[in-house]
Amino acid sequence: MVMEKLGDSLQGALKKLIGAGRIDERTVNEVVKDIQRALLQADVNVKLVMGMSQRIKERAMKEAPPAGMNPREHVIRIVYQELMEIIGKGAEIQLKPQIIMMVGLQGSGKTTSTAKLARYFQRKGLKAGVVAADTFRPGAYHQLKTLCEKLNVAFYGEENNPDAVEITRNGLKALEKYDVKIVDTAGRHALEADLIEEMEQINAVAKPDHKFMVLDAGIGQQASQQAHAFNDSVGITGVIITKLDGTAKGGGALSAVSETKAPIAFIGVGETPEDFEKFEADRFISRLLGMGDLKSLMEKAEETLSEEDVNVEALMQGRFTLKDMYKQLEAMNKMGPLKQIMSMLPLGMGGMGGVKLSDEMFQATSDKMKNYKTIMDSMTEEEMTDPKLIGGSRIKRISRGSGCSPEEVRELLKYHKTMQTALKGFRGGKFNIQKMMKKRLGM
């Protein structure tokens, strides 16, 4: 999950509201104190935290809840709105021809983000190419070239040319027919005079439509100083925050974004190209507060899965065979780690009724899903289509063929029956818990 520790702490604070007998000044102060602690531990700037805390207190005690909203929901809504105020709305990413310049510190994940960004635009139907203008770091050329080849992205570089400005000029000319051209510049300390001069020269030659600064989520309080230096040099138009997975604090990077007023454009939440997301502030805050992000989950499914992966029409008609379940397990595997998928579900769905699953439990569940596939690999086409045929003798045969126990085969059949019943229950209904929650809170 994105910033898991901060999310857990914020959700814990809001649970005090839900469990409180009445919402008075004492309750609000307790909740605000917990929110303060959570944000400060995540490296959010002290000034930002104190200002937000004061506004939450004042609004919670002075503002009357809108019609149809109880005091608890009103305070949660205020917290949501104030977090949105700190983070901002996010950058507007237009799908049109453009030049993008990438800047950032060495080790921030800038080169990897460059390739992933090109891949993002390609998935949206635009031709994207990358220029390797980082001549400072040994291995930068080969790293970017390898990434681009892996992602099937056009690449331009001059391995033995030390002149980054000349490479940029030549690269943009070579990629002239491409819609999106992304220039990867050298990553060093933002206050180094030679880096600033080189960035300014590349900026003058490339005339980029966007200048994205890449920040490591774990950079801490020094993020603000670095962000200001880059912004003063070339004028940052957007921020990409990398390594924003479960272990990252991330508050320093978020503070830098707030102070420079440069909107967040993308976030990196893992190693694969699929773990690179366009930033949507409302969805990000929803995930932090345990409201889930069903819209992102659906978009991820649409981007990753083909019509062959899941027979939606058959599912909605209540037809769910073992073949369908096998495809479903393969589809989930394509979408990424189970923990990441579950983090997009509202608390109570992904969190098993509000109880968060441990890493060990997620791993055990993933292992069980792999086990189920192994068992189904030992079934006949007839059995996969009609599970009712599987009796005692067939269970023994499947058990021997898969190397699993008869009990595990029976467990699989029971799981299939449970899924089949659940899908029949959803048929014809509109199930959108996140939409209901947000509508209830007026968000």
Curated annotation (Swiss-Prot):
Pfam families: SRP54, SRP54_N, SRP_SPB. Keywords: Cytoplasm, GTP-binding, Hydrolase, Nucleotide-binding, Ribonucleoprotein, RNA-binding, Signal recognition particle. GO terms for molecular function: 7S RNA binding; ATP hydrolysis activity; GTP binding; GTPase activity. It catalyses: GTP + H2O = GDP + phosphate + H(+). GO terms for biological process: SRP-dependent cotranslational protein targeting to membrane. It is found in: Cytoplasm. One of its GO terms (cellular component) is signal recognition particle. GTP binds at residues 104-111, 184-188, 242-245. The keyword Nucleotidyltransferase does not apply. The keyword GTP-binding applies. Involved in targeting and insertion of nascent membrane proteins into the cytoplasmic membrane. Binds to the hydrophobic signal sequence of the ribosome-nascent chain (RNC) as it emerges from the ribosomes. The SRP-RNC complex is then targeted to the cytoplasmic membrane where it interacts with the SRP receptor FtsY. Part of the signal recognition particle protein translocation system, which is composed of SRP and FtsY. Archaeal SRP consists of a 7S RNA molecule of 300 nucleotides and two protein subunits: SRP54 and SRP19. Belongs to the GTP-binding SRP family. SRP54 subfamily. This is Signal recognition particle 54 kDa protein. It comes from Methanosarcina barkeri (strain Fusaro / DSM 804). The gene is srp54.
